[in-house]
Amino acid sequence: MRVSGVLRLLALIFAIVTTWMFIRSYMSFSMKTIRLPRWLAASPTKEIQVKKYKCGLIKPCPANYFAFKICSGAANVVGPTMCFEDRMIMSPVKNNVGRGLNIALVNGTTGAVLGQKAFDMYSGDVMHLVKFLKEIPGGALVLVASYDDPGTKMNDESRKLFSDLGSSYAKQLGFRDSWVFIGAKDLRGKSPFEQFLKNSPDTNKYEGWPELLEMEGCMPPKPF
């Protein structure tokens, strides 16, 4: 091998060794020396979580008060829901709601659920509703939510029974109106827990139906 070839080989080896030493000495790093920018090193931003209380309320009810939330049905598509003291009494998921009037009875002192039933007010027999309303026990709270059509089969007797429970709108209830209500047996005066929307082409949110109603809050035992 010529001397020039040997020199080239030595030069190449020297360059490789020198480069390797340079990399090792100056470009090596450890994780301890890495400093991330503050915006990268900062711990992830915590999601803001809104604490919810019984029946999804954003504020807790006072001691000895009952939490409730009632939603009417949306058109003839989504059924109503009734929650009382964090118990879902009626809902589409429980498969115990129906077209017309959905009614739950609750003990006004203990909050215990006494029963629930749906009444078809479009093609059903209104006398089933009348019988049910007449048999409501004393001291019971009456929770009502409409779905689709709550008013077609209503008669004077059923309207009076609801009025006696504290309703201000039972006498006006008609075809496809939206209505949510909490009343009580032997109530003196009118209930403060009631919402009503008339079915009107000028104000309806859905085609042929008014907007669903949502009523929530807290009530004391024997609130009326």
From Swiss-Prot:
- Annotated Gene Ontology cellular component terms: extracellular region; extracellular space
Kindly indicate where the leader peptide sits in this chain.
1-25
Pfam entry (one): ILEI
GG-type lectin domain location is 64-222
Subcellular localization(s) per the UniProt record: Secreted
Entry-linked InterPro entries:
FAM3, ILEI/PANDER_dom, ILEI_FAM3C
One GO biological process term is: neutrophil migration
Q: Which cysteines are joined by disulfide bonds?
A: C55-C83, C61-C218
Q: Which controlled-vocabulary keywords does the entry list?
A: Disulfide bond, Glycoprotein, Lectin, Secreted, Signal
User: What residues are glycosylation sites in this protein?
Assistant: N107
- Tissue distribution: Abundantly expressed in placenta and weakly expressed in small intestine.
Q: Does this entry carry the keyword Aminoacyl-tRNA synthetase?
A: no
Q: Which GO terms describe its molecular function?
A: carbohydrate binding; cytokine activity
- The question of whether Signal is a record keyword is answered with yes
Which family is annotated?
Belongs to the FAM3 family.
Q: Identify this protein by name.
A: Protein FAM3D
Q: Which organism is it from?
A: Homo sapiens
Lineage of the species this protein comes from: Eukaryota, Metazoa, Chordata, Craniata, Vertebrata
